[in-house]
Regions:
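Alpha-helix capping/hinge segments and adjacent helical runs
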Residues: 341-434
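Amphipathic, small/basic residue-rich leader segments at the start of a protein or domain
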Residues: 1-99, 109-110, 121, 125-129, ...
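A short core secondary-structure module
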Residues: 123, 127-188
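Flexible, small-/acidic-enriched active-site or ligand-binding loops
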Residues: 184-210
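Glycine- and acidic
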Residues: 2-6, 31-36, 53-57, 69-74, ...
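A glycine-rich, basic-preceded beta-loop-alpha segment at the flavin cofactor/substrate interface
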Residues: 142-144, 207-252, 272-293
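Accessory "access/gating" subregions that flank catalytic or transport cores
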Residues: 213, 301-355, 360-363, 367
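Extended amphipathic alpha-helical segments enriched in small hydrophobics
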Residues: 247-327, 427, 431-435
Length: 435
């Protein structure tokens, strides 16, 4: 573009956001979702609610916090084993170790199963060799990468044994900067440059050229590689293993959903207050003009969306309760987890699309005043726009919801005899007819 990749205002914004993140880490607010033995509070629900609250302020801080504690920290917590927790979580929670979540590539976003970055095991040195085989396989749009991150949780195709056959996508911890902040040997880091919004987040690209990391850096909760390269996993089916691993990261989707709802509330507060104060037209002979909110056209412009925000708010509260229950369930009920993933996917899509639509409606309802930066619509529009894309493209997420519902129906039908199926269909037909 015409804008330089590094301008002073963006650098200042990034520096401020990093300072705020460190302050939050010192306060203990950002560690609530982690185990108490590592400095957390074992409170997934309070963690999500704290995160959502940041949407009332600078959304760059919200996203930066999400990358550091939700994505990078969440990958280590949910995909790593106890030794990873002991080594990394305390420093991560205190923001002494800043990290990235390197999943998306230039050529693959939604289709994570086909990412191109490779991690090839070398039994002679007991190391994984991390490599970017082409430009489409570089890690792209990665938060914390361009400036501040020192380690990346890299999702890559794991290759073990004599063949080039992949074991599927796994996550490996890769140091990307040394203590002085310089890129590690074989790691190329670049800045994504100017974005539509979220200027306080340092999104960057990562390319790996035969970068070696110890065998222990594989996050091995679900799959292990022995010293001789033998691969083992408690989940034999590679597709099921992949979706189980991704399913543990559902908290990010739930968090973005809540953040979108809260950002929408900010826009609606401004617009409704403006509508109650601003006067325009009125009956002939009246002493003063009527407020905008007196007019049904203005009410219809704002109030149905406001009602929907209330509905989404309460739906989100229920989703957070479900998330907390599922992640504190020692039995690990697969069905409950699948239902949670379906709910989170659907609500995230609905809430973020609602945010994009409603913030624009609120801006228009404030007239020229809505176009002034001081009234926050510029930042709200620019910073929330990508919410419909990250943590899952909304259209793809709705397809995930459809798949989840069909799977659920199939499960119910399998448990029914012919009479039961007839009763089930009849009940649903009656229900739809009544609606």
């Amino acid at each position: 573009g015409n804008e330089p990749a590094h301008d002073s205002s963006r650098e200042d914004h990034r520096e401020r956001v990093l300072g705020w993140l460190r302050e939050l880490a010192e306060s203990g607010e950002t560690g609530k979702g982690f185990p108490s033995e590592y400095g957390g509070e074992d409170a997934v629900d309070r963690s999500v609610v704290s995160f959502e609250t940041l949407a009332f302020g600078d959304l760059s801080l919200l996203v930066k916090v999400g990358v550091q504690f939700g994505l990078f920290g969440g990958a280590i917590l949910h995909l790593g084993s106890e030794r990873h927790h002991e080594e990394y979580l305390p420093r991560l929670i205190r923001a002494e170790l800043l990290g990235c979540f390197a999943m998306t590539e230039t050529g693959h976003g939604s289709n994570v199963q086909e990412v191109g970055t490779t991690a090839t095991y070398d039994p002679e040195t007991q190391e994984f060799v991390i490599h970017t085989p082409g430009e489409q396989c570089r890690k792209d749009y990665i938060g914390n990468a361009a400036r501040d991150g020192h380690m990346a949780a890299v999702f890559c195709q794991l290759i073990t044994g004599d063949s080039d056959e992949t074991r599927g996508v796994h996550c490996v911890l890769v140091p990307i900067r040394d203590e002085q902040g310089n890129p590690m040997p074989g790691v190329e880091i670049s800045d994504c440059g100017a974005k539509l919004g979220l200027d306080g987040v340092d999104n960057g690209r990562l390319t790996f050229d035969q970068v070696r990391v110890p065998r222990e850096n594989l996050l091995d909760r679900y799959a292990q590689v022995a010293e001789d390269g033998t691969y083992t996993s408690s989940i034999e089916n590679p597709t099921k293993r992949f979706f189980t691993m991704l399913g543990t990261l559902v908290q990010g989707r739930v968090s973005v959903c809540g953040a979108a709802i809260n950002a929408t509330k900010v826009a609606q507060v401004v617009a409704v207050r403006h509508g109650l104060e601003r006067r325009q037209f009125g009956p002939p002979g009246a002493d003063e003009e009527a407020t905008l909110m007196t007019y049904r056209t203005h009410q219809r412009r704002l109030l149905p969306d406001l009602a929907k925000t209330y509905a989404l708010h309460f739906a989100q509260e229920g989703l957070v309760r479900d998330l907390h229950a599922v992640f504190n369930d020692d039995d690990g009920d697969d069905r409950r987890r699948r239902e949670l993933e379906t709910l989170a996917a659907g609500l995230k899509a609905i809430a973020t699309w609602h945010a994009t639509h409603t913030i624009q409606q609120c801006r228009e309802a404030c007239g020229g005043a809505g176009y002034l930066r001081g009234n926050r619509f510029a930042a709200l529009k620019a910073d929330t726009d990508v919410f419909t894309t990250f943590e899952g493209d909304n259209t793809v997420l709705l397809q995930l919801v459809a798949k989840g519902m069909l799977t659920g129906y199939r499960g119910e039908f399998e448990e029914l005899n012919t009479l039961g199926i007839a009763a089930f269909v009849a009940a649903n037909v009656v229900e739809r007819f009544v609606e």
